[in-house]
Regions:
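Transmembrane beta-strands of outer-membrane beta-barrel pores
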Residues: 13, 27-33, 48-52, 59-65, ...
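Residues that define the transmembrane beta-barrel architecture of outer-membrane proteins
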Residues: 3-7, 36-40, 68-72, 125-131, ...
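Outer membrane beta-barrel strand-and-loop segments of large Gram-negative receptors
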Residues: 122-124, 130-136, 146-198
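Outer-membrane beta-barrel transmembrane domain signature of Gram-negative proteins
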Residues: 1-51
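Residues on the lipid-exposed face of transmembrane beta-strands in outer-membrane beta-barrel proteins
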Residues: 7-13, 27, 42-48, 61, ...
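Repeated loop/turn-to-beta-strand initiation elements of outer-membrane beta-barrel proteins
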Residues: 14-23, 50-57, 82-87, 141-147, ...
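Outer-membrane beta-barrel domain signature, especially the mid-to-C-terminal portions
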Residues: 101-123, 154-178, 204-219, 238-261
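Flexible, glycine-rich linker and terminal segments associated
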Residues: 64-68, 72, 77-148
Length: 261
C-alpha cells in the first residue's frame, strides 16, 4: 500500500541585484508499506543576464525526515557565435525518495516481489550531484545540434539483481554508490511547424558493475502534426550491452550474464 500527498508553492519577483528571482517550496507526505516519510524542499533561484552570457544560480534546502542537505545550482550559457554557437556549464543536484511504484516500474521482468525481501523495509533516497559541459548551435534552416559531457555522483542508485539460495530464486532491487561519465549528442530538425525529427545518442561509463543498465542508447524520433485532431509519432531505439547479475545467499557476486543488445 502506498499513498502520496504533495503541496507546492511558487513566488516570483524582480530585484535590482538578483534580477528575476523565483522561490519554490514543495512539501510531500509519503506512506509506503508501513513507513511514513516527510520531505520538504525549498529553493531560491535567480537569473541574471550579462553582455554575452546568461547565468542562473540557486540554493536549495532539502529536508527528508530529520536529514538536511544544502544543494547549490549554477547554470551559465555563453554566446560564442552570434545566433549560431553557444557553450554551457551546469552544476547541480537533487535528492529523490524512492517509492514502491519506482520499484515495480523499474523491475525489468515486472515480477511480483515483497519489499521486505530487500535489505530494509525502509525506502532509501538517492542524492545526485552532477556537472556538465556542453555546446549547442544551429547548422542550417531548422536544424540544430548539441553535444555534452557530464560527470555524475549518486549515493543510492537502484538496479535489479537476481538472488538465489538452495531453495528459491528471486529478483530484488539493490542500491549502490555510483559515479558515472556520460557523453551525449543530439540533432534536431524541424523544417516546418508540422514535421519534427530528432536523433540522440548517449554513452555512459560506470565505476560499478550494474544489472540491466545499458551503457549506450541511440534513438530516432519523429512527429507529424496533421491537424488539431490527428498527429503521428514514432521512434526507433537501440540499447547497448547489458548484464544480468546474480548474487548468492550471502549477497556475494555469483555470476554476470551478458544480454543481447
Amino acid at each position: 500500500e502506498e499513498r502520496l500527498f504533495s503541496v507546492e508553492s511558487q513566488h516570483e519577483g524582480m530585484h535590482k541585484k538578483l534580477n528575476h528571482w523565483t522561490f519554490k517550496n514543495n512539501f510531500s507526505f509519503q506512506h509506503s508499506a508501513s513507513q511514513n516519510y516527510v520531505h520538504w524542499q525549498s529553493q531560491l533561484k535567480s537569473k541574471k543576464k550579462f553582455n554575452l552570457a546568461d547565468a542562473q544560480m540557486a540554493l536549495a534546502v532539502d529536508v527528508l525526515q530529520s536529514n538536511i542537505k544544502l544543494i547549490p545550482e549554477l547554470s551559465v550559457q555563453y554566446q560564442l557565435i552570434e545566433k549560431g554557437l553557444y557553450s554551457s556549464f551546469e552544476l547541480g543536484g537533487d535528492r529523490a525518495l524512492y517509492t514502491l511504484r519506482d520499484l515495480y516500474i523499474s523491475n525489468p521482468y515486472l515480477q511480483y516481489f515483497v519489499p521486505e525481501d530487500t535489505s530494509s523495509e525502509e525506502l532509501p533516497s538517492n542524492t545526485k550531484y552532477y556537472t556538465r559541459l556542453g555546446l549547442n548551435g544551429n547548422l542550417f534552416g531548422g536544424v540544430s545540434y548539441q553535444v555534452s559531457v557530464a560527470a555524475t555522483s549518486q549515493d543510492n542508485f537502484m538496479h535489479y539483481v537476481h538472488h538465489s539460495n538452495a531453495l528459491d530464486e528471486w529478483m530484488a532491487p539493490a542500491y549502490t554508490a555510483l559515479k558515472s561519465l556520460e557523453l551525449h549528442a543530439g540533432l534536431d530538425a524541424q523544417w516546418t511547424e508540422n514535421i519534427h525529427f530528432w536523433l540522440k545518442a548517449d554513452y555512459k561509463r560506470f565505476d560499478q558493475y550494474l544489472s540491466y543498465v545499458p551503457n549506450m542508447e541511440l534513438g530516432l524520433y519523429g512527429f507529424y502534426h496533421y491537424n488539431e485532431q490527428f498527429y503521428l509519432s514514432g521512434s526507433l531505439r537501440y540499447i547497448g550491452e547489458r548484464y544480468a547479475m546474480r548474487l548468492d545467499e550471502l549477497n556475494y557476486f555469483d555470476e554476470g550474464q551478458k544480454l543481447d543488445p
